[in-house]
């Protein structure tokens, strides 16, 4: 991209890619307008037409919102095919409001290649999982799934729309999200939404 509007087109391309990764379907034109600070939907349509002409996106004429970022488009964004998204921050202490923004991308570990497209990473904040070897500042690799077996470590969304990393247990009439820290109490919930199962761990700095 070399024309004056190239940066804006890349911004739009990035927003489309991140939105699809986050919620599995593309944004509306008005959502794109808001995200990239454009007031005119016709301007966005023009940028989308140019992105399609360059081969960065594919559109389905029969489905107005069907937009797919192509491999060429991912290359323009610097995203390798085996990269996985790092999504916001999730607590491993007291739950915090879940953040669903994609911060960056991380190379997929070779032993998890079969899970490509179903994985995301979250940075852990807190010490509630230290007995399981998950420390403050670690990145957990999570397989997207909506259920888990008792004893598995999951990323769960509580009824207050907060995300947390805990060991999952389904009890009689309630759910228990158990920390791996002897000084902390479990979280007891009548309803819990599982975002995924922790399948790996990445630590950038080791003391």
UniProtKB/Swiss-Prot annotation:
Chemical reaction(s) catalysed: Hydrolysis of Ala-|-Gly bond in repressor LexA
InterPro entries (UniProt xref): ArsR-like_HTH, LexA, LexA-like, LexA/Signal_pep-like_sf, LexA_DNA-bd_dom, LexA_repressor, Peptidase_S24_LexA, Peptidase_S24_S26A/B/C
EC number assigned by the record: 3.4.21.88
List of catalytic residues: 128, 166
Xref: Gene3D superfamilies: Umud Fragment, subunit A, Winged helix-like DNA-binding domain superfamily/Winged helix DNA-binding domain
Portion annotated as DNA-binding: 29-49
CDD domains in alphabetical order: HTH_ARSR, S24_LexA-like
Site feature: Cleavage: 92-93
Entry GO MF terms: DNA binding; serine-type endopeptidase activity
GO BP term, pick one: negative regulation of DNA-templated transcription
Superkingdom, natural source: Bacteria
Keywords: Autocatalytic cleavage, DNA damage, DNA repair, DNA replication, DNA-binding, Hydrolase, Repressor, SOS response, Transcription, Transcription regulation
Quaternary data: Homodimer.
Family designation: Belongs to the peptidase S24 family.
Known function: Represses a number of genes involved in the response to DNA damage (SOS response), including recA and lexA. In the presence of single-stranded DNA, RecA interacts with LexA causing an autocatalytic cleavage which disrupts the DNA-binding part of LexA, leading to derepression of the SOS regulon and eventually DNA repair.
Protein name: LexA repressor
Organism: Lactobacillus johnsonii (strain CNCM I-12250 / La1 / NCC 533)
Gene of this entry: lexA
